[in-house]
């Protein structure tokens, strides 16, 4: 079997370094390119330098050259560079795995449009456990239905720049969808001062940013006399990286916009 050629954007970042290991660990993939922004001190270094691997792939800022020798790009960077990479992937018919969060509506529309021309897997979280959690939340929300106050609490490391996390927002979207609500209309982001009684139709969000928390997410359903909590805690970024590589292998040869639920076969159940 010919190995799938995977390039990584933001290879010198926290996720990028773990992705190098994940690609190296998978029996059916090989690292074909490593991207960093112009001016990065890592340019020219071996892509595996930070994790003790010798990949033979030099870190580059030449997107065109990297994509020309790759089957798929994995991108966990920021919205602006991700959208630029997305356009290049469409032009060169290279699949893309997007783990970047914080897109506005225009960015999400661009991703959706790209799915008409190449293979795109766009997910708020690539952890298998988190995606099973999404599946559970849909079931729980439908069964409990009305009468429960819903709150989502998430925590991440001090360096995370967007809040709430993409995973927390996706949890809210899943719950709202199961209840026939529009998250944009019912979400409450933080509370301060005299807020008055809680509106039972709302879904609340609370955010923690501290230390080196990789990712903690809890969905709370509370009513008089009982409380249901569904929690996922990540202790290593490898869970996200391994899921992204799994998605890259799965989307090979496909065109369309998919999420991790598709990769795991959960949308067919």
From Swiss-Prot:
Keywords: Amino-acid biosynthesis, Cytoplasm, Diaminopimelate biosynthesis, Lysine biosynthesis, NAD, NADP, Oxidoreductase. The keyword Oxidoreductase applies. GO terms for biological process: diaminopimelate biosynthetic process; lysine biosynthetic process via diaminopimelate. One of its GO terms (molecular function) is 4-hydroxy-tetrahydrodipicolinate reductase. (S)-2,3,4,5-tetrahydrodipicolinate binds at residues 157, 166-167. NAD(+) binds at residues 10-15, 36, 99-101, 123-126. Its EC number is 1.17.1.8. Pathway: Amino-acid biosynthesis; L-lysine biosynthesis via DAP pathway; (S)-tetrahydrodipicolinate from L-aspartate: step 4/4. The keyword Oxidoreductase applies. GO terms for cellular component: cytosol. It catalyses: (S)-2,3,4,5-tetrahydrodipicolinate + NAD(+) + H2O = (2S,4S)-4-hydroxy-2,3,4,5-tetrahydrodipicolinate + NADH + H(+); (S)-2,3,4,5-tetrahydrodipicolinate + NADP(+) + H2O = (2S,4S)-4-hydroxy-2,3,4,5-tetrahydrodipicolinate + NADPH + H(+). It is found in: Cytoplasm. It is an enzyme of class 1 (oxidoreductase). Catalyzes the conversion of 4-hydroxy-tetrahydrodipicolinate (HTPA) to tetrahydrodipicolinate. Belongs to the DapB family. This is 4-hydroxy-tetrahydrodipicolinate reductase. It comes from Neisseria meningitidis serogroup C / serotype 2a (strain ATCC 700532 / DSM 15464 / FAM18). The lineage of its organism: Bacteria, Pseudomonadati, Pseudomonadota, Betaproteobacteria, Neisseriales. The gene is dapB.
């Amino acid at each position: 079997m010919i190995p799938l050629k995977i390039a990584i954007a933001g290879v010198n970042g926290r996720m990028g370094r773990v992705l190098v290991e994940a690609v190296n660990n998978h029996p059916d993939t090989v690292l074909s390119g490593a991207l960093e922004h112009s001016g990065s001190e890592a340019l020219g270094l071996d892509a595996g330098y930070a994790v003790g691997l010798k990949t033979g792939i030099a870190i580059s800022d030449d997107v065109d050259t990297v994509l020309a020798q790759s089957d798929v790009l994995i991108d966990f960077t920021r919205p602006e560079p991700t959208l630029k990479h997305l356009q290049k992937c469409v032009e060169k018919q290279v699949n893309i795995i997007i783990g970047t969060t914080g897109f506005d509506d225009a960015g999400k529309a661009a991703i959706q449009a790209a799915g008409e021309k190449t293979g795109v897997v766009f997910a708020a979280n690539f952890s298998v456990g988190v995606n099973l959690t999404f599946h559970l939340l849909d079931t729980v929300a439908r069964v409990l239905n009305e009468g429960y106050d819903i709150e989502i609490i998430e925590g991440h490391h001090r360096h995370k720049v967007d809040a709430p996390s993409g995973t927390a927002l996706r949890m809210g979207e899943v719950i709202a969808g199961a209840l026939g609500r529009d998250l944009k209309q019912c979400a409450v982001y933080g509370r301060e001062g005299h807020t008055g009684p809680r509106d039972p139709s709302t879904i609340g969000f609370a955010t923690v940013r501290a230390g080196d928390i990789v990712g903690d997410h809890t969905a709370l359903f509370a009513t008089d006399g009982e409380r249901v909590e569904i929690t996922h805690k990540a202790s290593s970024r490898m869970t996200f990286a391994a899921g992204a590589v799994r998605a890259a292998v799965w989307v090979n040869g496909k065109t369309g916009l998919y999420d991790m639920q598709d990769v795991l076969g959960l949308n067919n159940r």
